[in-house]
């Protein structure tokens, strides 16, 4: 996941979590090693113009995408409230970076090992119920997290944008792997997205599509390294 860049150094920062064979191989690379291809960014740039007060909600590795969005918002003079969620403290990323661009910063962990115990929706609900008003909520993370963030913000009538990260192959819309239903219409995350109005996305369909290759992923993961057994 692309998290940052340095135009002067000509570098891009990516953050990944080992979840399968591909990320396991990526984790073996050392300084000076290379990968065959690196493609991006894809789709349409995130819209941040004109926003004065935004709540950015990030979950897990999705925080790597949420950070540059929060950074861009802060640079434009927007007031940024950030909520990040992780399973445990061990998986926490980009804390100093988020604090540097956030007017308010909240950490939630499933096990309570850091920040407050609970879900990002718990923190967001408290803010909304306390009377906080936002031009927009931007949620980036696991599909189930974004689904429930959108369900919550819909209760309060707050516009919510999400960043979709479905399976992609060619990145041009030709393969159709990243297609989604948004507002009853077919969209492609790689060319029309990745940002969409969360209240218009068919999350159930998106979650079903995400599991299409799970058997093949499990097989490849097992073949790569038996250290993954039981994980």
Q: What are these model-derived regions, one by one?
A:
Residues 3, 15, 36-38, 191:
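Residues in well-ordered beta-strands of folded domains
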Residues 21-169:
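FNR/FR-type flavoprotein reductase catalytic core
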Residues 65, 143-144, 165-195, 223-229:
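Local cysteine-cluster metal-coordination motifs and their immediate loop/turn environment
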Residues 188-192, 196-231:
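Short Fe-S-cluster ligation motifs
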């Amino acid at each position: 996941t692309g998290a940052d860049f340095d135009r002067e150094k000509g570098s891009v920062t990516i953050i990944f979590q080992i979840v399968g064979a591909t990320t396991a191989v990526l984790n073996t690379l050392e300084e000076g090693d290379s990968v065959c291809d690196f493609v991006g960014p894809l789709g349409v740039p995130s819209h941040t113009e004109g926003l004065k007060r935004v709540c950015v909600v990030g979950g897990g590795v999705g925080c790597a995408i949420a950070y540059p969005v929060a950074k861009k918002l802060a640079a434009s003079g927007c007031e940024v409230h950030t909520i990040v969620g992780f399973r445990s403290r061990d998986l926490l990323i980009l804390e100093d970076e988020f604090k540097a661009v956030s007017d308010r910063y909240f950490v939630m962990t499933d096990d309570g090992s850091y920040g407050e115990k609970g879900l990002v929706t718990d923190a967001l609900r408290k803010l909304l119920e306390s009377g906080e008003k936002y031009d927009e909520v931007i949620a980036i993370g696991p599909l189930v997290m974004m689904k429930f963030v959108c369900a919550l913000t819909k209760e309060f009538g707050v516009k919510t944008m999400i960043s979709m990260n479905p399976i992609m192959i060619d990145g041009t819309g030709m393969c159709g792997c990243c297609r989604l239903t948004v507002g009853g219409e077919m969209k492609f995350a790689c060319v029309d997205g990745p940002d969409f109005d969360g209240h218009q996305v068919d999350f159930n369909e998106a979650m079903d599509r995400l599991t299409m290759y799970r058997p093949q992923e499990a097989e490849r993961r097992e073949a790569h390294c038996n250290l993954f057994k039981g994980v």
